[in-house]
Amino acid sequence: MHTQPQSYQAPEQTHMRIENRRIEAGKGGTNLLLIIESRVDTLSINLPTLYSLLFTTNITILMSAPQHRQLRRAAHITKIASIDLCSLEEEDHEDLVLEESGHHPSDIQNEKPNRPPYSTLIRKRSGKVFRFVRPKLADLWHSRYHEASFDLGRRLGIGRRTQSCCEDVCDEEVSVETMAITALPMDVWLKERLKKWVQLSGHEGSIVPATPHTLYKKQCANCGEGRAYKNISKDPALDGFTPKYYDELEKNEEHFIEIEDLLQQFHDPTKTAIMDIKIGTRTFLESEVSNTKKRADLYEKMVAIDNDEPTEEERKCGAITKLRYMQFRERESSTAQLGFRIEAAKRLEGALEKNFKKVRTVEDVTTTFMDFFGTQRSRVRQQLIERLKSMRKAIEHSSFFNSHEVVGSSILIVFDTEKVGCWMIDFAKSSPVPNGRTLNHRTTWIPGNNEDGYLIGIDNLVKILEELPEYGEHPDDQLMVTEEVIARMKNTKS
């Protein structure tokens, strides 16, 4: 039985599809990625001709149908990733069966390199298995075999070598232009990226690198984030203000979406300052607080945070509703007052910081921003103001925001010494407004009106940035320079 893979256009890659029991590739079916895993350390690919080789982020191999037949008969080749199968017109191609196999991205965090990557298996009924990975590169990066050494233009005698490994490949020894690949059982690229990987917020391991330019984000049960991103991608007003959305997948009963890694827009993502700001006066869905049952566990949590908070009636009852607890938590931060709160940040020359629970007032936020922007304050501040004003205008004209409550979303701020970026991220709690009503995102929330205060948060964010002093106007600025120099020296020594 043939399985139709989901139509998917990967970033800067080639689109694959199944059509009439024949595997084809878009864009002429020529430029695909070839990686071989061999049972031996060094594998000489027995291809009669190597037409083209381009080594940038991938390798381009052009092959003809006879070459496919020869390669597929090589018993010592156990896995083929993203090979050009557009010319697979052999008499036995109906014997090919596509099967799904793989593991989920969280395995990468746990360093389980022996698990097979996400892929589609091409399994012959004879039992031989060839692995075909759709060309979105994610599977390759999740494999231990993404690294290979190349010996170009080397003339190799392949007859005797392959004769011992497979049947009916070559009748006599011949010399051909080919390529020797040494499969290195290591994940250098992935380890290097994970070593530099910074996840500001969310559960650890819920977001992992997928490709050099995309991320896998794990989805909770009944999460509509993929649907939200699809709707956003259809809204021209929001173009460029959110990560690009590529795919939604399910593995082992777990759901993931693949989105753009915004940090890859910067020259060196490891040398960027990053801040996650939760936007809105409400960070919970109405459905989450619809239950009016009073709970003792929530009362205990409230008392642990602030023993003076409970009312006399609540103390007698020893229990509170979820709505009461959530509103209390939001008053503890700047969410209720300003319509946003700082979740996490990493300074340009500093470590990740997540302890912003005491940042509540305008003065607290101002001090935090000054520390975060450092000596880049004047430049970053001005560019952020312009970007946020453009974002605000886009939201006001957005069909998506007009018809959706957007709860728990964040503004992601990223900058380095040359560039400043600002985007909206996290749409897991976005949902359509019932009964065709529209939202303005500035009206005060009352149960039932679905208003989220998104624009209240952006309005206040812009206002605070506009009132932020230029660099050099504050007494602490000279101290800031000294701290940055010390931090830079420490990083250089390490």
Swiss-Prot record:
EC top class named in words: transferase
One biological process term in Gene Ontology: inositol phosphate biosynthetic process
Source superkingdom: Eukaryota
Binding site for substrate: K278, K322, L323, R324, Y325, M326, Q327, F328, R329, K429
Membrane-spanning segments: none
UniProt tissue specificity: Expressed in spermatheca.
Gene3D superfamilies referenced in this protein's UniProt entry, alphabetically: Inositol polyphosphate kinase
Gene Ontology cellular-component annotations: cytoplasm; nucleus
Pfam families attached to this UniProt entry: IPK
Keywords: ATP-binding, Kinase, Nucleotide-binding, Transferase
One function term, GO molecular function aspect: inositol hexakisphosphate kinase activity
Keyword Phosphoprotein in record: no
Assigned EC number: 2.7.1.127
Keyword Nucleotide-binding in annotation: yes
Residues that bind ATP: S206, K218, E260, D261, L262, D276, K346, D426
Activation/inhibition comment: Unlike mammalian IP3K, may not be regulated by calmodulin.
Catalysed conversion reaction: 1D-myo-inositol 1,4,5-trisphosphate + ATP = 1D-myo-inositol 1,3,4,5-tetrakisphosphate + ADP + H(+)
Family listed: Belongs to the inositol phosphokinase (IPK) family.
Function: Probably by regulating inositol 1,4,5-trisphosphate levels, negatively regulates posterior body wall muscle contractions required for defecation and let-23 signaling pathway that controls spermathecal dilation and ovulation. May also regulate ovulation downstream of actin cross-linker fln-1.
Name of the protein described by the UniProt record: Inositol-trisphosphate 3-kinase homolog
Organism (species): Caenorhabditis elegans
Phylogenetic classification of the source organism: Eukaryota, Metazoa, Ecdysozoa, Nematoda, Chromadorea
